[in-house]
Structure formats: structure tokens, C-alpha cells
């Protein structure tokens, strides 16, 4: 079964995602590292958006983030539609997979689906076997990075609507 965002709300599914992510992150390194600055520049080069202040803000957020020291094999595009159960959980669509901070995968799940604080903490706590509180500040950094990249990506796409960009922009500003 291909997941939809509502699957994340079902009992035990967030914990199942965390467990599956731990297995993914234990795989050998790919030898390619995710460079958010290069990705951002590629998106910015094709943006026709008049919100130059938000573009600049997103670029600053991304530039502040440095390549993490704790690299692991990451999916980097974990949206619900890239998760299936058949009967175990598997991830699809590996085109963005490369080495990155493991918390970027968690941040993608949290921010792409606009999970609330409680669900975000459950994911983090399950991923770190009950030690999620200690990792909340690092997750927040990765959430900010994901939102900035996601907004730039969305702004670079001709099929994106202004309503989508505005809604995501409000989330970035909170």
C-alpha cells in the first residue's frame, strides 16, 4: 500500500517510520554528500518570484548550515507517497539519496506533512529510543533547513501556486 499523509496519523506508524529510518541510516555511506548550498543555488537560478526577501532569508538559513560530521545514508525525500507497506515498510524514489545528517530525513517527515509538536517528538523519541529531548534543537535546525529548501524548490517550479508559496512562507516565518 502506498502511503498518504493520513497514514502518519495511524497508531504506531510514526514509530514504525522511526525504526525503518534507523535501519536505513545504518547502511554504508553512499560516497556522495548532500550539499544544500548547491541545491539552493540551482533552485534560485530558476526562480521568478518577486518575494526577494524570502528568497534571501532561505539562502541565509541554508548557508548557515554546514555539512554535518555525522553523515549517514539518507533518503532525503521522505514524503508519505514515498513510503509503502507490503507487508513491511519500504521507501521508494531514491533519486535524492546520498549521505546527509540523519535528522534531515526526520525533518522532512515533520515539515513536509506539517506534523504537530507532539507527533514530531514521538518520531524523534522513537528514533532515539527514548532520548528524543536531547535532539530537539538539532531537529529544529534541520526543519528550518528543509523548509528553506522546500520553499526554494517550490518557487522554482512553474506549476507552483502563489497560495502554496504563501502558506509555506508563513510556516518559515513562525
Predicted regions and their residues:
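Conserved protein kinase catalytic core
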Residues: 83, 99-101
Amino acid at each position: 500500500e502506498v502511503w498518504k499523509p493520513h497514514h502518519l496519523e495511524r497508531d504506531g506508524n510514526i514509530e514504525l517510520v522511526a525504526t525503518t529510518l534507523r535501519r536505513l541510516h545504518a547502511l554504508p555511506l553512499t560516497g556522495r554528500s548532500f550539499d544544500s548550498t548547491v541545491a539552493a543555488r540551482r533552485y534560485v537560478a530558476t526562480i521568478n518570484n518577486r518575494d526577494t526577501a524570502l528568497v534571501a532569508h532561505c539562502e541565509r538559513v541554508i548557508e548557515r548550515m554546514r555539512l554535518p560530521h555525522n553523515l549517514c545514508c539518507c533518503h532525503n525525500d521522505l514524503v508519505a507517497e514515498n513510503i509503502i507497506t507490503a507487508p513491511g515498510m519500504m521507501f521508494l524514489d531514491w533519486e535524492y539519496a546520498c549521505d546527509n545528517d540523519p535528522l534531515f530525513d526526520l525533518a522532512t517527515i515533520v515539515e513536509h506533512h506539517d506534523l504537530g509538536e507532539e507527533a514530531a517528538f514521538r518520531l524523534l523519541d522513537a528514533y532515539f529510543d527514548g532520548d528524543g529531548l536531547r535532539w530537539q534543537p538539532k531537529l529544529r535546525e534541520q526543519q528550518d533547513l528543509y523548509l528553506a529548501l522546500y520553499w526554494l524548490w517550490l518557487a522554482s517550479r512553474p506549476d507552483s501556486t502563489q497560495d502554496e508559496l504563501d502558506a509555506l512562507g508563513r510556516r518559515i516565518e513562525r
